[in-house]
Amino acid sequence: MQNITQSWFVQGMIKATTDAWLKGWDERNGGNLTLRLDDADIAPYHDNFHQQPRYIPLSQPMPLLANTPFIVTGSGKFFRNVQLDPAANLGIVKVDSDGAGYHILWGLTNEAVPTSELPAHFLSHCERIKATNGKDRVIMHCHATNLIALTYVLENDTAVFTRQLWEGSTECLVVFPDGVGILPWMVPGTDEIGQATAQEMQKHSLVLWPFHGVFGSGPTLDETFGLIDTAEKSAQVLVKVYSMGGMKQTISREELIALGKRFGVTPLASALAL
């Protein structure tokens, strides 16, 4: 029998959650991570599955995700502990045939359940599937320190925030040319914030929750982690720059345009126009 804890997807989740903890992005039970899988990924591990998988209904049907398996972090679970006990802190779930709920196939032992932000994740997965023609498979939410800090001092506007991050580090425009979506402050763990996040995910691979954290989407765990890491590095630079009295020089609009042309990306027009 193959051990599912040695699978690429469990090992990938262990690495991503451990790296996020070491970055300081996921204190206590902060943060959540979901990865969309294929049936072929989990097929070799059926012997590891629960004999009687628990069924949990979704608060709203998501037919686009019907029959789709995911590996997810658990509600109330600490990222720092995933590496110590993957089966207690992670779970493999599979949405049923009509998208009305899901079965917990593996993990989430002792009656644990998936992250409370699962509505936001699933709704965002739906939008990123459509926006990227199925390429994006990962949704990651974390409490990236400097990005949160900037939501207190910058105008919480997509164009303004995006332009500042682009200027904070040259690679940012290349990594997220579609910019950063921003929500108003909302109560977490609700369908409302999930729907608002998904709406922004139609246009952006990064979405900020002011005074709370960030959502990122990408095709792989590495790409998604790297996306957030890049934005957070720029935010860290900006926090230092603002603390030293502000910018005396920066990357110009013309230089940003040249950067986009060199790397074949189309920068968000509203941010470029500022």
UniProtKB/Swiss-Prot annotation:
<feature type="binding site">
    <location>
        <position position="141"/>
    </location>
    <ligand>
        <name>Zn(2+)</name>
    </ligand>
</feature>
<dbReference type="InterPro" id="IPR001303">
    <property type="entry name" value="Aldolase_II/adducin_N"/>
</dbReference>
<comment type="pathway">
    <text>Carbohydrate degradation; L-rhamnose degradation; glycerone phosphate from L-rhamnose: step 3/3.</text>
</comment>
<protein>
    <recommendedName>
        <fullName>Rhamnulose-1-phosphate aldolase</fullName>
        <ecNumber>4.1.2.19</ecNumber>
    </recommendedName>
</protein>
<dbReference type="InterPro" id="IPR036409">
    <property type="entry name" value="Aldolase_II/adducin_N_sf"/>
</dbReference>
<keyword id="KW-0862">Zinc</keyword>
<keyword id="KW-0963">Cytoplasm</keyword>
<keyword id="KW-0479">Metal-binding</keyword>
<dbReference type="GO" id="GO:0042802">
    <property type="term" value="F:identical protein binding"/>
</dbReference>
<feature type="active site">
    <location>
        <position position="117"/>
    </location>
</feature>
<dbReference type="Pfam" id="PF00596">
    <property type="entry name" value="Aldolase_II"/>
</dbReference>
<comment type="subunit">
    <text>Homotetramer.</text>
</comment>
<comment type="similarity">
    <text>Belongs to the aldolase class II family. RhaD subfamily.</text>
</comment>
<comment type="function">
    <text>Catalyzes the reversible cleavage of L-rhamnulose-1-phosphate to dihydroxyacetone phosphate (DHAP) and L-lactaldehyde. Also catalyzes the dephosphorylation of phospho-serine in vitro.</text>
</comment>
<dbReference type="GO" id="GO:0046872">
    <property type="term" value="F:metal ion binding"/>
</dbReference>
<dbReference type="GO" id="GO:0005829">
    <property type="term" value="C:cytosol"/>
</dbReference>
<keyword id="KW-0684">Rhamnose metabolism</keyword>
<dbReference type="GO" id="GO:0016832">
    <property type="term" value="F:aldehyde-lyase activity"/>
</dbReference>
<dbReference type="InterPro" id="IPR013447">
    <property type="entry name" value="Rhamnulose-1-P_Aldolase"/>
</dbReference>
<dbReference type="GO" id="GO:0019301">
    <property type="term" value="P:rhamnose catabolic process"/>
</dbReference>
<dbReference type="InterPro" id="IPR050197">
    <property type="entry name" value="Aldolase_class_II_sugar_metab"/>
</dbReference>
<keyword id="KW-0456">Lyase</keyword>
<dbReference type="GO" id="GO:0008994">
    <property type="term" value="F:rhamnulose-1-phosphate aldolase activity"/>
</dbReference>
<feature type="binding site">
    <location>
        <position position="143"/>
    </location>
    <ligand>
        <name>Zn(2+)</name>
    </ligand>
</feature>
<dbReference type="GO" id="GO:0019323">
    <property type="term" value="P:pentose catabolic process"/>
</dbReference>
<feature type="binding site">
    <location>
        <position position="212"/>
    </location>
    <ligand>
        <name>Zn(2+)</name>
    </ligand>
</feature>
